[in-house]
Structures are given as C-alpha cells and as structure tokens.
UniProtKB/Swiss-Prot annotation:
Source organism phylogeny: Bacteria, Pseudomonadati, Pseudomonadota, Gammaproteobacteria, Thiotrichales
EC number(s) stated in the UniProt entry for this protein: 2.8.4.3
Encoding gene (name): miaB
Protein name as annotated: tRNA-2-methylthio-N(6)-dimethylallyladenosine synthase
Annotated ranges, domain Radical SAM core: 145-378
Entries under HAMAP family matching the protein: tRNA_metthiotr_MiaB (MF_01864)
Cofactor dependence: [4Fe-4S] cluster
This protein's record includes keyword Cell inner membrane: no
Source organism (scientific name): Francisella tularensis subsp. holarctica (strain LVS)
Length: 442
C-alpha cells in the first residue's frame, strides 16, 4: 500500500510552470498517493516551482524558503523542494544559501521527483538534478487528470532563440518537440474528462516541429487542425509565440479552424528596430506589422496582446516613442509590460545602461496607461454584444454568480444555474468594469 502524503505546491511564473506543477502532483500521486493541501504548514512535501525571468521573481523564491525554514525545524521529515527555472540556474547554490532544502530539480527532471525523495530519505543528503536528459520527461509522466473544462498541454520545451536579455535557453534547455501523436493522445484523454478548451504551451510554441509516426514533421498549424477534430474540444489557444515563426500556415489556420480562439498573444517586446536588433529578436517592426495585417484580413476583430520591455540598455526617448506608436497602431489589448531586468549570464547584461530608473519607471507608466486605455475601449465596445463564454465556476465575490471567459480572455460575471459550470453559454454583455464584464444569460 502506498504511503499517503500531503503536498503543497507554490507556482511562480508562466503557464508552462502551471502545467509543470500539475504534472508534479500527478507523478508524486502515482508513487505516494498524495493529496493536495492549500496550507503549507500541514504538508509533508512542500515544492516551489520557480521563475527566473526577472530578478524580483528570483528573490521571491528565497523569501518563500525563509517562511518554510521554521517548519522544517519542528518537522524533520518534511521534504522541501525547489523546481523550475531558478533551480536550473542556481543548482547547488540554492542548497548553499538554504541548506534546509532537500530537493533541487529542473523543468526536465520532474519525472525523477519520487526517486529523488526516496534517495533523500535513504541518504539524508540533499538531492540536486537539473540536467537536460535526452529522454524527455513526457515519456515518464502519468496520464493527465483534468481539473475543470480548461487544460494546458505542453507540446515543446526549451528555446533556441537566445534573445540577448533572456535566460530561458539556459534554464529550459534547447528546443525539444513532443511527438505529434503523443500530443493528440493527451488532448483526447483530456476531452474524455470534460475539457473543452486546450491551451498549447511552449517557450516558442509556434516553432513546433513534432515528429510524426509516418516519418514526417507536423507544424503548429497542422497540430491545431487535428486537435480541432477531437470530439469535445471547442476552443484552442497557444502561447508563447515568436513573430519570426508566426507563419503563413498558422495565419491560414485562423480562416479554417473556427475552434481557434479569436485572440492572439504575440510578444513583440519593443517598437524600435534599433532596440530589437540589440535584443537579437531577428525581425523588424515592418515584418511584425505585415503579419498582423495578414491575420486581420482573415479575422478583422481579433484581439492581440503582447509582451513589452521598457528601459532596455540604450533605449532613448525616440525609441520609446516608437513603442508607443506601435501600441497605438496595432491597438494592443491587455498586455504584459516590465522594466528591463538584467539577468546574469545573458549578453544584454554587459550592455551599457545609463538611463535613470526614474525615467524607466515613467516610461513604464506611460506605456501601461496606454495599454489600459486600449483595453478599456475594447471592453466598452463589447457592451451589447453576445459572447460565447466558457463557464469556469462561480464569482470570487458571490457564489451565486457564474463566471467565465470570452475568446479574448475577458472575465464575465452573470446569473445562471451552476449546472452550466464546465459548459459554454451565450451571454449578452451589459456592463464594462475595470477588470471584468457583466452580462445576462441568453
């Protein structure tokens, strides 16, 4: 009989980490019959799945570990583990800085967690495995278990882009594409469990080149076509994309696959070609605009979100103004924007940077004000329209109100029977609020 253990997992960072955290619990459950707990003080195993994109995210890890240190003193059998990209980047240094940590594991070694725990218990020595094994983790992970009507499916790992500011190629490793048939099988399993919306994940997801059993290679567009044919799957998203691989095949899929959500997240990072060159993004603003124009010729009302970095080394006011101009021209929806964070070991970390932090903060505020204005206008334009909502559950503020999301990721709250949870519903939008919409069930 397997020993039951309570597991607490804290997830920082991107959707890929959310996916990995779910798989951590599944692989532990297969060996230890685990149950999740929301209270780390009640756990037998505490894991933190980390992000290293920005310095503040990295410091969050050690802040959390500091909170858990005291529990370890009163419970010697407690297992504390650090996974994710900070684990890959720091490795043994985590143990040196926090000796009470038992496990340090990378994104590619999740499947080894049970064995690492057993080795720790046997040897009483901290275990570190941040390797990039040739046999990918997907081969050893158990069948996914759906939690609701939406699910993430990882189709590739790693990145070969080596943008000058980014640590992902160093922490996630080179690109590894999951076999085409394996992805379809996972999507079919999830559909049988009631999943209706799939989000395909990868650090550079639209560069997916999955090996097929017939010896050919499938790109993301072909994969999307096949997933759309699976009974029960009614909405498909993908993230995160790179403009260079946003291909004509993928653009054409928006014309032929109605299940493909009418929303695209396509990180451009900046609006100045000079800055893009220094970022090693390998495309121009004109090339980006041309792809957006082709997409909008097919889906005129598609909403587009992005990622932006403000204050990159050498950024001038003229460069920044070009970024604002791009945001206005494309009419970007809700987006992620940050002040550049120097990451050790990346080429950009060595670039001279003499822009005062106050200037960077001012630019970030101006950018975010513009993005928020765009988003509010888009939300107000939705009032009076009928939207197809995937009902996630009840509102955080009122258990009698249902809540779900539109294709363009707007949260909509409306009255309805709880039997609609996990289903699609048509809702007329009646009011636009700063962070959500209100509607009426049709």
């Amino acid at each position: 009989m397997k020993e039951q253990k309570k597991v607490f997992i804290k997830t920082l960072g991107c959707q890929m980490n959310e996916y990995d955290s779910a798989r951590m619990h599944e692989v532990l459950n297969e060996h230890f019959d685990t149950v999740k707990t929301d209270d780390y003080k009640d756990a037998d195993i505490i894991l933190i799945n980390t992000c290293s994109i920005r310095e503040k995210a990295q410091e969050k890890v050690f802040h959390e570990l500091g909170r858990w240190k005291g529990i370890k003193k009163t419970n010697e059998d407690l297992i504390i583990g650090v996974g994710g990209c900070v684990a890959s980047q720091e490795g043994e240094n985590i143990i040196k800085r926090a000796p009470f940590v038992d496990l340090v594991f990378g994104p590619q070694t999740i499947h080894r967690l049970p064995e690492m725990i057993k080795q720790k218990q046997k040897s009483q020595q901290s275990q570190v495995d941040i390797s990039f094994p040739e046999v990918e983790k997907f081969d050893y992970l158990p069948e996914p278990k759906a939690e609701g009507a939406k699910a993430y499916v990882s189709i590739m790992e790693g990145c070969d882009k080596y943008c000058s500011y980014c640590v992902v190629p160093y922490t996630r490793g080179p690109e590894v594409n999951r076999p085409f048939e394996d992805v379809l099988a996972e999507c079919a399993i999830l559909a049988e469990q009631g999943v209706k919306e799939i989000t395909l994940l990868g650090q550079n997801v639209n560069h997916y080149l999955g090996p097929m059993e017939n010896g050919q290679t499938a790109d993301l567009a072909l994969l999307i076509h096949f997933i759309a044919e699976i009974d029960g799957i009614e909405r498909i998203r993908f993230t995160t994309s790179h403009p260079v691989e946003f291909s004509q095949n993928l653009i054409d899929a928006y014309a032929t696959v109605p299940e493909l959500a009418n929303h695209l997240h396509l990180p451009v990072q900046h609006g100045s070609d000079r800055i893009l060159i220094n970022m090693k993004r390998n495309h121009t603003i004109l090339e980006f605009k041309q792809k957006i124009r082709k997409l909008r010729a097919i889906r005129p009302d598609i909403t587009i979100s992005s990622d932006f970095i403000v204050g990159f080394p050498g950024e001038t006011e003229e460069d920044f103004q070009k970024l604002l101009d791009l945001v206005k021209e494309i009419n970007f929806d809700q987006s992620f924007s940050f002040i550049y964070s120097k990451r050790p070991g990346t080429p950009a970390a060595d670039l001279p940077d003499d822009t005062p932090m106050e200037v960077k903060k001012d630019r970030l505020k101006r950018l975010q004000d513009l993005l928020n204005s765009n988003a509010q206008i888009i939300s107000r334009q939705m009032v009076g329209t009928n939207q197809r909502i995937l009902v996630d559950g009840t509102s955080k503020k009122d258990d009698n109100i249902l809540s779900g999301r539109t294709e363009n990721n707007r949260v909509v709250n409306f009255k309805g029977d709880k039997s609609l949870i996990g289903q699609f519903a048509m809702v007329k939008i009646t009011e636009s609020l700063p962070n959500s919409l209100r509607g009426e069930l049709i």
